[in-house]
Amino acid sequence: MNKKLKIIIAGLLVNVASMNAIATEVGSTYFTAGVMKISTDELDVLAASGVTIDDEDTAVTFGVGYQFDENLSFEAGVIGESEASATLSGSESGTINGKSYSISGALTIKAQTDTSYTLGMRYSSPVNENLDVYGKAGLLFWDLKGLVSADGTLTYDGSTYTASGTAQFYQNDGNDPYFGMGGSYKLNQTTSLDLDYIKMEVDDGDVDGLSLAVNVDF
């Protein structure tokens, strides 16, 4: 048997083995658990001198998927709570009714996203026996709250007064599409490590998510 024929046969055997490996996954269920780094432009409209914006947070993620085709799976997931905040701080002093006063304090506005849910599809394609790349798309179901909190101190005529409090000034919920891509590296026969990036929209604000999760087949 010449060298070229050996190479062809070896290639066919590898392809058959790969097809068999994929076929055994059809009809299986998998679970994922991980963390997602979230960044949003929800509060960028408040950007100005003296305003500090924190637009990143970390949320836990959980998901379940069903492989109904060699490449396609149906997925449902949960993304934990996250928030972005903008803090406006300052101080002022002067006189009122002939008596001195000074004010120092901070106002914080938060865009708080409660637990969100995803429903979508994932298309996977093998690169080699251990690595898959995939794309995903679906709907994100979200619930957003706007909170404002104030912490301040007033000193008037030598007496100091402190006030603080938090109030909700906005609430909305809805659903918007998401899409993303990623890669899955097989650690063993049942466990993989998924790394992906998704693009979402929450209440007209753009949200980016970079997640790392453990994927376990059953």
Feature-to-residue mapping (PLM):
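Short glycine/proline- and aromatic-enriched beta-strand/turn motifs that initiate or cap beta-hairpins
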Residues: 21-70, 74, 141
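Outer-membrane beta-barrel strand-turn architecture
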Residues: 25, 67-70, 125-129, 141, ...
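Hydrophobic, lipid-facing positions within transmembrane beta-strands of outer-membrane proteins
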Residues: 29, 58-62, 115-119, 177-181, ...
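Repeated loop/turn-to-beta-strand initiation elements of outer-membrane beta-barrel proteins
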Residues: 29-31, 71-74, 130-133, 185-195
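Extracellular/periplasm-exposed beta-strand and loop segments of Gram-negative cell-envelope proteins
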Residues: 39-57, 80-115, 142-174, 201
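Solvent-exposed loop/turn segments connecting transmembrane beta-strands
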Residues: 127, 173-175, 200-209
